[in-house]
């Protein structure tokens, strides 16, 4: 009673005035879950005497505890102990904590409360005899770790038990925080029973109220006994009553969460009874407490050394300590919500600051705490804690806002170790059982797995607590080790332990650690840790808030108008570096500090931010850091890939200044070393500028903010760092050195930053693979591939951005006013391509830098007027007129031709990420090296009309190219016709590429006309050119855009006409022979395989773009049919194609929606293309294009390599065989097995009847062959082996899988097709060409059935093999040879 009297206010003291009626009764908590509750409550009983009555019952323990209990405990009416009302009735134990309360060990004493349905076993475990709350009471037996005096509550063992018990209860616990027992309390006691104030509530635990109180889960609740009870009653939930509890708005949630949490925590708690309060106890508690308040948990923390805790309170709760020390368990400093523990961490004083971060975060998490997800609470999804107690569903439930202290007994630290765990732990640690979660973080890692077992028992404490482990857990700062409590967390290094507390340490450990508090994540681990730790701890011990607030940096920043809280966070994060802090603040201001302060909650927030830096996103506050961050980018835009943070949400990233990211990055790959998870983290880290950006994409607002804020502009330091990293990247070949000479837009800088970040992470991931160790190779490889894709995407985006920017500058060299506009355009494009993140970083636009490819778009001002006038430059610089409109996002292209269409294509491509080739370049056209030309092609592809416009633009080949204007190119269609033509001047149609200009001209129009080109999507992989247009395909350049065509054509044309003329300097790789030269591009096609598919409409967009009707000589005889459906009958399609001329080969890739037909002549192919384009077949409109050889090769390489056989006549057999083999080899999988060469299959196994195609074509055997091995389908093909004679296609079952596809036709004679497994279906010996399998014309001896479908048997249904007209064997052989070359 005395203590109650001492309490200064209703809140503060749980023992509210006796005279007060204890509003609690007046508003008994809705019985919530306990029917008995009401009786127990006996709200009527509240006459103010409850308090003393409770005390009496408690055996002289300050009834106050109970009183408060009643205050709100009472409310619950269904108290475990039959809280107040019951108390009156008598069973003290039942009432309130009594039993539990009794004795600090409480272990046995554990609450006698059984009545409330919670029976506390001696173990302190709540037996819960039907705890009203459903056990809300988790019997939070904190089993304190220490059991120290503080632990009053159940002894440590009690904790464990309690934990278990609690956990059981936990389910309900939430519902009723009051149920939560003081963690320490062995028994689960209704929180109501327990005194809020008293923390003691357990009654068990120590007569020393304060101890109890510390421990008391209600502790937090303690605040405002009356309020609590009143609140409880009024609120109807424990939670409610502790509004302070971190906005228990979450209460409901918390309750829900609590239960879940309880469960999860239980396990934790159980695992380490000793674990310090934070340990299992808290876990337990957390289950309950979290249930309840978090504070309760805090109690739990308290348990760990509640006293210590109070002692540790240290800065946080100065007032509090005294009360605690006062042994007024009930004393509430108003932070009770936060829970004493919080108190410890920062219950009162700064709880908002640091603790909050902790507390709030935890609160946020609180609900979530259990789950680790909670930790992420803000993140919510993250569950990073993953490892953490997954069982704690609540965490997710709760939400970022769930500020309630959180489940973990520690309130903020909801055992959740899980919550927190996620942080660094997530990575491997997390599994730690979450336990580690908290503290461990860094250790966690250690503990991580290892610890997990032990859970480090201290979840919170974790690790650091290590040292203090038990003690500290959260609440105790004292244990310094404690994550929370102490920032000291001595082990800063462990810091992790600090998980929370440590910001830096965490980082170290894994960002995670930082995640929470580690504001400093970025900052040096140790330092930060220290600083942060202090701060973090909520105690703000080291760099505690007081120190920060007294610092000059703080004053200066505050005087500059930044919010104090933000300044404090920023300084913590920046390690008191005022410059960095100012950068962060400015950046945040744009976000309204949203990201930062998004959780206003307190340092935690910034700590998280840090983390986010390291792990993935401020926004996450709770670091998203899990491995996923790396994934984050995927979801939003390419940039997201960059920032693992994307997960966290755009805000945080943005908040995180690029600088921070950069800094983080500079620190090295924090996570990478860890391994895949590290990689994940690193990806988060990788965010860098990009992170902001990516998030921006994620959160448009964020990007907007960035754009809005000059803050977002990188600081000088950031830029310097970025410059250094760019130089390194240039040395590494990731970036062209030209980027150094180009002006960079802000967007480009962001992209570069992301690129660098990804490169760094890629390297780290690769190193981790090299290093080996306990790294999951698969995960690392996935991460590596992800990084590579991101890098490629970023390069493409950078190229596109620079191209647009440069283009715009060119258009208005003098006025860079348009730059913003330009950027907008890019944004637009980007949006198309999913590069939204690019948009909005305009602030950086001013920055200049170029990527080598980007150099194509040399800023007019930048290079000098002379360059602009040089045709070459103009080539490099896209024509602004057209480009700006159509191509705002287009990647830089070599030719100056505008790539209007290209733009659209480009964006698609980018979004698809298809174009892979050039690091920077878009890789528009497969064949061409020059990007610009692709636009022409694209134009063609996109619309027939466009080509015209493109043509018009370039009509005059001779016409000079003017930088700001689209180069008109010459009117002359074929280069041959234009004497003045130069590579850069030609605007001819892509067809001009063809060695024979005439054809090219002819096709150029058709190509343009052909809608199929429209989808230039095909990303032909060429980096330079999108090159969907196959029209020009012939030119290696020509692929590029039509506009470019002139150029490409110029180049190609000449090339075609005279090999001597090569592509422009940078594009030499694409030889003049687009088919072959482009071959290299096909690699570019990387995206291509996809790309070409993608561009399904665009078709392969081979360089040739057969639009031109196969203008390219090489490609002209090929016909690419796109937009097919798997329902189309292969044989029917083949027959349809054969109507326009004999097919040298037919490769249906119906599953990919395309088919390749090779005619003996280009004329036939062109004819077929014109006839079949837009032809309606089965429920689809076929788009026919004339791909270049390169495109064909790319397709065949990337698609199931089951080119239908290039059938070679059986006779040529021997000959062909040889060729076939080689060709096949090239195709390897391609089922070609020319007759007899099964071996050709790439496997060679089916050598089959070599030349003897007809021979009997033992080829069949190939089945064995490895045909199957290399291509499944191929095998089939092999079987099909054409051997004409036997036609036994037997097809050894060979790839039956493909076989269906393949249905090889045997030679005309047998005509067997091998569909289906090895059966030769023979479709009758009839060699009807129709048969899919036999489909080969009768003549053709060989039908190679190529199953083109290595991917899909169905696809191939139509036998690929197409028999060649018999008369043409020689041609066929030649063609086969070519085909094989192409395949190669």
UniProtKB/Swiss-Prot annotation:
Q: Where is this region: Not required for interaction with AGO1 or miRNAs or for localization to P-bodies but necessary for miRNA-mediated silencing, dissociation from AGO1 and miRNAs and interaction with pAbp?
A: 1200-1384
Q: Which GO terms describe its molecular function?
A: RNA binding
Keywords for the protein's UniProt record, in alphabetical order: Cytoplasm, Developmental protein, RNA-binding, RNA-mediated gene silencing, Translation regulation
Show the domain comment.
The UBA domain is not required for correct subcellular location, gene silencing or interaction with pAbp. The RRM domain lacks RNA-binding properties and does not bind RNA in vitro. It is not required for P-body localization or for interaction with AGO1 or miRNAs but is required for silencing. May play a role in protein-protein interactions.
Gly residues: which segments have biased composition? Answer: 1211-1220
**Origin species:** Drosophila melanogaster (Fruit fly)
Chain intervals with Polar residues compositional bias? 15-24, 449-475, 485-501, 898-924, 1052-1061, 1188-1203, 1350-1365
Give the highest taxon in the source lineage.
Eukaryota
The protein here is known as: Protein Gawky
Q: Which InterPro entries match?
A: Argonaute_hook_dom, Gawky_UBA, GW182_domain, GW182_M_dom, GW182_RRM, Nucleotide-bd_a/b_plait_sf, RBD_domain_sf, UBA
Q: Where mainly found?
A: cytoplasm
Q: Where is the UBA domain?
A: 547-588
Q: What is the lineage of its organism?
A: Eukaryota, Metazoa, Ecdysozoa, Arthropoda, Hexapoda
**Residues annotated as region Sufficient for miRNA-mediated silencing?**
1-605, 605-830, 940-1215
Q: In what ranges is there compositional bias, type Low complexity?
A: 150-171, 809-826, 1010-1022, 1068-1084, 1318-1349
The Basic and acidic residues compositionally biased stretches are 208-225
Q: Domain RRM: where?
A: 1117-1189
Subunit details for this protein?
Answer: Component of the miRNA-directed RNA-induced silencing complex (miRISC), composed of at least AGO1 and gw, which bind mature miRNAs and targets the selective destruction of homologous RNAs. Interacts (via N-terminal region) with AGO1 (via Piwi domain); the interaction is essential for localization of AGO1 in P-bodies and for miRNA-mediated silencing. Interacts with pAbp/PABPC1; this interaction interferes with the binding of pAbp to eIF4G and is required for miRNA-mediated silencing.
Residues covered by region (Minimal N-terminal region required for miRNA-mediated silencing): 205-490
């Amino acid at each position: 009673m005395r203590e109650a009297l001492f309490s200064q206010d209703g809140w503060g003291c749980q023992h509210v005035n006796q005279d007060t009626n204890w509003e609690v009764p007046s508003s008994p908590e809705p019985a919530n879950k306990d029917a008995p509750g009401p009786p127990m409550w006996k709200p009527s009983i509240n006459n103010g005497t409850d308090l003393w009555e409770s005390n009496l019952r408690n055996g002289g323990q300050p009834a106050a505890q109970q009183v408060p209990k009643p205050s709100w405990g009472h409310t619950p009416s269904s108290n475990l102990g039959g809280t107040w009302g019951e108390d009156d009735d008598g069973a003290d134990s039942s009432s309130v904590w009594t039993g539990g309360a009794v004795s600090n060990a409480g272990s046995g004493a554990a609450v006698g409360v059984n009545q409330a349905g919670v029976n506390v076993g001696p173990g302190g475990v709540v037996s819960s005899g039907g705890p009203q709350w459903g056990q809300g009471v988790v019997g939070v037996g904190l089993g304190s770790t220490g059991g120290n005096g503080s632990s009053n509550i159940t002894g440590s063992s009690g904790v464990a038990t309690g934990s278990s018990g609690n956990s059981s209860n936990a389910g309900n616990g939430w519902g009723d925080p009051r149920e939560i027992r003081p963690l320490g309390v062995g028994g689960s006691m209704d929180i109501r029973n327990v005194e809020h104030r008293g923390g003691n509530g357990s009654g068990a635990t120590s007569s020393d109220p304060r101890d109890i109180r510390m421990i008391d889960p209600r502790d937090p609740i303690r605040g405002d006994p009356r309020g609590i009870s009143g609140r409880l009653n009024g609120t109807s939930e424990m939670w409610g009553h502790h509004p302070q509890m971190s906005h228990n708005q979450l209460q409901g949630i918390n309750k829900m969460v609590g239960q879940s949490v309880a469960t999860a925590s239980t396990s934790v708690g159980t695992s380490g009874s000793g674990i310090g309060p934070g340990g299992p106890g808290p876990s337990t508690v957390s289950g309950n407490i979290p249930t309840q308040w978090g504070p309760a948990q805090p109690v739990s923390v308290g348990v760990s050394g509640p006293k210590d805790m109070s002692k540790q309170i240290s800065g946080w709760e100065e007032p509090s300590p005294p009360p605690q020390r006062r042994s007024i368990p009930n004393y509430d400093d108003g932070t009770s919500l936060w829970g004493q523990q919080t108190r410890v961490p920062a219950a009162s004083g700064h709880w908002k600051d640091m603790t909050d971060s902790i507390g709030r975060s935890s609160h946020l998490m609180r609900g979530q705490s259990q789950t680790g997800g909670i930790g992420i609470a803000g993140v919510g999804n993250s569950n990073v804690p993953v490892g953490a107690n997954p069982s704690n569903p609540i965490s997710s439930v709760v939400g970022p806002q769930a500020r309630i202290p959180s489940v973990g007994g520690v309130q903020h630290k909801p055992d959740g170790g899980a919550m927190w765990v996620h942080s660094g732990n997530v990575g491997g640690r997390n599994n730690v059982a979450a336990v580690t979660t908290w503290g461990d973080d860094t250790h966690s890692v250690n503990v991580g797995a290892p610890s997990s077992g032990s859970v480090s028992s201290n979840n919170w404490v974790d690790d650091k607590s290590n040292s203090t482990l038990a003690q500290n857990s959260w609440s105790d700062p004292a244990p310094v080790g404690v994550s929370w409590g102490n920032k000291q967390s001595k082990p800063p290094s462990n810091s992790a332990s600090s998980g929370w507390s440590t910001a830096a340490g965490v980082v170290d450990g894994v960002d995670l650690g930082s995640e929470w508090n580690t504001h400093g994540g970025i900052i040096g681990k140790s330092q930060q840790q220290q600083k942060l730790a202090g701060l973090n701890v909520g105690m703000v011990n080291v760099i505690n808030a007081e120190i920060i607030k007294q610092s000059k940096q703080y004053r200066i920043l505050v005087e500059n108008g930044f919010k104090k809280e933000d300044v404090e966070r920023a300084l913590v994060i920046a390690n008191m570096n005022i410059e960095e802090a100012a950068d962060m603040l400015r950046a945040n201001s744009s976000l309204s500090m949203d990201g930062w302060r998004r959780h206003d909650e307190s340092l935690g927030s910034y700590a998280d931010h840090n983390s986010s830096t390291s792990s993935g996103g401020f926004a996450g506050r709770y670091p998203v850091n899990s491995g996923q961050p790396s994934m984050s980018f995927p979801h939003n835009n390419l940039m997201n890939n960059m920032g693992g943070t994307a997960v966290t949400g755009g805000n945080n990233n943005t908040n995180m200044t690029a600088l921070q990211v950069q800094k983080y990055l500079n620190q090295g790959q924090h996570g990478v070393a860890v391994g895949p998870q590290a990689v994940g983290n690193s990806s988060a880290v990788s965010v860098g500028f990009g992170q902001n950006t990516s998030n921006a994409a994620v959160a448009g607002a964020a990007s907007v903010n960035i754009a809005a804020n000059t803050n977002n502009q990188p600081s000088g330091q950031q830029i310097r760092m970025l410059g250094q990293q760019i130089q390194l990247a240039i040395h590494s070949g990731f970036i062209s050195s030209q980027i150094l000479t180009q002006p960079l837009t802000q967007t480009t800088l962001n992209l570069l930053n992301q690129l660098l970040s990804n490169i760094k992470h890629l390297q780290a991931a690769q190193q981790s693979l090299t290093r080996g160790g306990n790294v999951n190779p698969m995960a690392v490889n996935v991460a590596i591939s992800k990084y590579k894709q991101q890098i490629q995407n970023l390069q493409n985006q950078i190229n596109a951005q620079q191209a647009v920017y440069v283009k715009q500058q060119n258009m208005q060299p003098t006025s860079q006013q348009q730059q913003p506009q330009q950027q907008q355009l890019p944004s637009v494009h980007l949006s198309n391509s999913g590069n939204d993140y690019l948009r909005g970083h305009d602030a950086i636009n001013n920055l200049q830098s170029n990527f080598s490819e980007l150099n194509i778009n040399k800023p007019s001002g930048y290079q000098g007027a002379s360059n602009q006038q040089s045709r070459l430059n103009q080539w490099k610089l896209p024509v602004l007129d057209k480009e700006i409109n159509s191509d705002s996002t287009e990647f830089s292209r070599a030719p100056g031709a505008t790539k209007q269409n290209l733009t659209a294509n480009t964006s698609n491509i980018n979004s698809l990420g298809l174009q892979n080739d050039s690091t920077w370049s878009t890789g528009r056209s497969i064949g061409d090296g020059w990007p610009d030309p692709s636009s022409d092609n694209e134009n063609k592809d996109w619309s027939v009309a466009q080509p015209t416009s493109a043509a018009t633009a370039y009509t005059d080949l001779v016409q000079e190219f003017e930088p700001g204007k689209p180069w008109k190119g010459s009117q002359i269609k074929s280069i041959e016709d234009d004497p003045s033509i130069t590579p850069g001047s030609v605007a001819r149609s892509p067809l001009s590429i063809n060695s024979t200009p005439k054809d090219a001209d002819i096709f150029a129009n058709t190509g343009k006309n052909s809608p199929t080109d429209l989808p230039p999507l095909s990303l032909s992989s060429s980096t330079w050119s999108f090159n969907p247009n196959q029209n020009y395909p012939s030119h290696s350049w020509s692929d590029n855009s039509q506009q470019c065509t002139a150029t490409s054509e110029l180049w190609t044309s000449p090339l075609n006409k005279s090999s001597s003329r090569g592509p422009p300097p940078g594009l030499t790789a694409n030889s003049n022979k687009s088919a072959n030269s482009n071959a290299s591009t096909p690699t570019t096609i990387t995206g291509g395989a996809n790309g070409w598919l993608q561009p399904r409409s665009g078709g392969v967009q081979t360089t040739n773009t057969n639009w031109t009707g196969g203008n390219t000589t090489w490609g002209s005889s090929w016909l690419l049919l796109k937009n097919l459906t798997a329902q189309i009958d292969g044989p029917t399609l083949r027959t349809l194609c054969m109507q326009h001329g004999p097919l040298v080969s037919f490769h249906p890739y119906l599953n990919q929606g395309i088919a390749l037909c090779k005619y003996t002549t280009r004329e036939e192919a062109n004819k077929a293309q014109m006839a079949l384009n837009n032809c309606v077949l089965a429920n689809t409109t076929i788009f026919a294009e004339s791909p270049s050889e390169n495109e064909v090769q790319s397709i065949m390489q990337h698609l199931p390599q089951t080119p239908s056989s290039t059938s070679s006549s059986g006779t040529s057999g021997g000959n062909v065989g040889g060729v076939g083999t080689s060709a096949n080899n090239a195709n390897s999988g391609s089922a070609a097995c020319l007759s007899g060469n099964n071996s050709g299959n790439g496997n060679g196994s089916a050598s089959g009847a070599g030349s003897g195609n007809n021979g009997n074509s033992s080829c069949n055997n190939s089945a064995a062959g490895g045909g199957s091995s290399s291509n499944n389908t191929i095998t089939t093909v092999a079987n099909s082996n054409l051997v004409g004679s036997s036609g036994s296609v037997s097809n050894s079952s060979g790839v039956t899988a493909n076989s269906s596809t393949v249905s090889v036709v045997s030679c005309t004679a047998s005509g067997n097709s091998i569909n289906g497994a090895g059966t030769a279906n023979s479709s009758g010996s009839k060699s009807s060409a129709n048969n899919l399998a036999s489909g080969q014309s009768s003549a053709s001896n060989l039908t190679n059935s190529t199953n083109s479908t290595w991917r899909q048997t169905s696809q191939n249904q139509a036998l690929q093999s197409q028999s060649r007209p018999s008369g043409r064997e020689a041609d066929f052989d030649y063609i086969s040879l070519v085909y094989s070359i192409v395949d190669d």
